[in-house]
Structure formats: C-alpha cells, structure tokens
C-alpha cells in the first residue's frame, strides 16, 4: 500500500453531477430566498432559524442523494483519503476508511457544544421525504423537518443533547475530533 495521502474537494464530484463549490450552480452560490449560503451554513442560523437551515440542507440532499460515484471516486476507493466533500460519494464508491473532514449530509449528530464528540447517526432525510413525497409545500416540509430533527415546532429552538444537527462543519464552527481532525493530522 502506498503512503500517498489524497485530499479532494468539490471538483471530484462534478462528473457525478454535483456543481463545484462556488460554480454557477454551486453548493455555496445558491442560497435561500432570504439568506446567502454563507449566512445559511452557520451554527447561528441553525440556532436562530432551524426551519430555514434544515430546509436549505434538505433541498441539497434530495438533489444529490441518488447521484453515483464517478471514475475518480472509484479510483480513490482503496486510497488513503481526506475529502472536503459532504456528498457521500466516496463511501458509495467503496472507500470505508476515508475522512470526511467537513462531515457528511448522510449523517447527523445530537446538538451539542462544539467541544463534545458524539456518535453519528443516519440522517432522517428518508423519513422527511416519505412524509412529504407528494407535497411541494415548504411550510409542511419545515414542520416535518423540525419533528424529524427533534426541534419543537412551537419554540423553534434546538435543544442541547436532544435535537439533531446535520453532520456538516459550518462556517462559524471549528475543526474538532468529531471531524476526526486529530486522525487527519497524523496521516
């Protein structure tokens, strides 16, 4: 086995149909109706407007969830890899030991202080999609998202140790061992 470490970013997934990081339709260039991506993808937005935050991430997940890994993902499937991509395509390609240094849209954690390392769980996107499969109503979608992520639809306040948060490193967060930063530093 080679001692080569591969580090990848958004360009790797472009051939699978995922826009590049800041391209014309990129993940970080398309915001919500009222907020920029840099405002949406923050812990502060998750706390202040969890319904908007979750709707924004959900719409990205639904758009990308059925895409397939491309030849680069497959080539990297047995390599030592750190990826900045949150799309999960490296996992779908068969790489079970890569480090998703920015997290993964397929996973969630319980909402904790940033220093706390918690177990990862499967994201409840399927549950949300099943409940809203025939509806284009964003208000219904917000309600279902809040319920699936254990956030009160009355208070709209995520609760520490109870609510779920997408396993994604946000702009106003820092690397911790939740994102396997210590392990990445030793590669």
Q: Where are the regions a protein language model picked out?
A:
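Conserved catalytic core of sirtuin-type NAD+-dependent deacylases
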Residues: 1-187
């Amino acid at each position: 086995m080679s001692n080569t470490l591969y580090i990848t970013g958004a360009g790797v997934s472009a051939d699978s149909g995922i826009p590049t990081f800041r391209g014309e339709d990129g993940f970080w260039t398309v915001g919500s109706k009222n907020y920029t991506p840099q405002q949406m993808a923050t812990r502060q937005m998750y706390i202040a407007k969890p319904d908007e935050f979750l709707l924004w991430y959900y719409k990205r997940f639904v758009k990308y969830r059925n895409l397939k890994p491309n030849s680069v993902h497959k080539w990297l499937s047995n390599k030592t890899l750190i990826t900045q991509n949150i799309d999960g395509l490296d996992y779908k390609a068969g790489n079970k030991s890569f480090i998703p240094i920015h997290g993964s849209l397929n996973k969630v954690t319980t909402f904790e202080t940033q220093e706390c390392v918690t177990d990862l769980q499967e994201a409840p996107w399927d549950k949300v999609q099943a409940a809203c499969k025939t509806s284009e109503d964003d208000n219904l979608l917000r309600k279902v998202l809040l319920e699936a992520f254990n956030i009160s639809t009355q208070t709209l306040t995520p609760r520490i140790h109870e609510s779920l948060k997408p396993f994604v490193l946000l702009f106003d967060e820092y690397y911790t061992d939740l994102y396997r930063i210590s392990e990445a530093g030793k590669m």
